């Protein structure tokens, strides 16, 4: 079942985030609360077994990936992070969250979903997931101030 993220889910989210921190930005209780306060979409599935946090293009959230996307596209929903607990992977939870996120975007007339996936360190499973679910590569970017490189993806939902 998909529902809102509540403070009771924070501990599990922080634990999952830490497991995958090589692909995700680190989080604390405070930074998670701030992230959720600014997020357009913040849902969990199966009592926190998975989460998806996303932003509209005009959300009050400053981040280098969102900044890059704002310079490339006019109107979009951005997937900031999706995390599925190790024990729940392979059960279709990410797909269910993405489908729900897509419904939310369509209900607001948003023409595309966008995200980035690490290429350094490479997150091969995430690349495969996004391609399988209709996302197309946009561009590979290496940030000079970081050890991380990403590939941006987009999925068209509506004509602009």
Label for each model-derived stretch:
Residues 119-139:
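Conserved active-site alpha-helix within GNAT-family acetyltransferase domains
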Residues 105-119:
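Conserved GNAT acetyl-CoA-binding A-motif
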Residues 84, 90-103, 132:
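Conserved acetyl-CoA-binding loop-helix of GNAT-fold acetyltransferases
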Residues 39-56:
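Conserved beta-hairpin
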């Amino acid at each position: 079942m998909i529902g809102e993220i509540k403070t009771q889910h924070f501990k599990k989210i922080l634990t999952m985030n830490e497991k995958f921190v090589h692909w995700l930005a680190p989080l604390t209780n405070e930074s998670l609360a701030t992230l959720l306060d600014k997020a357009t979409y913040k849902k969990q599935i199966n009592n926190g077994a998975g989460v998806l946090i996303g932003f509209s293009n005009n959300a009050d959230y400053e981040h280098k990936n969102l900044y890059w996307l704002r310079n490339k596209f006019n109107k979009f929903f951005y997937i900031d992070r999706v995390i599925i607990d190790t024990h729940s992977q392979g059960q279709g939870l990410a797909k269910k969250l993405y489908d729900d996120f897509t419904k939310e975007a369509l209900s607001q007339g948003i023409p595309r979903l966008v995200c980035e996936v690490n290429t350094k360190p490479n997150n091969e499973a995430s690349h495969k997931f996004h391609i399988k679910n209709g996302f197309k590569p946009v561009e590979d970017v290496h940030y000079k101030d970081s050890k991380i490189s990403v590939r941006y993806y987009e999925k068209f939902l509506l004509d602009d």
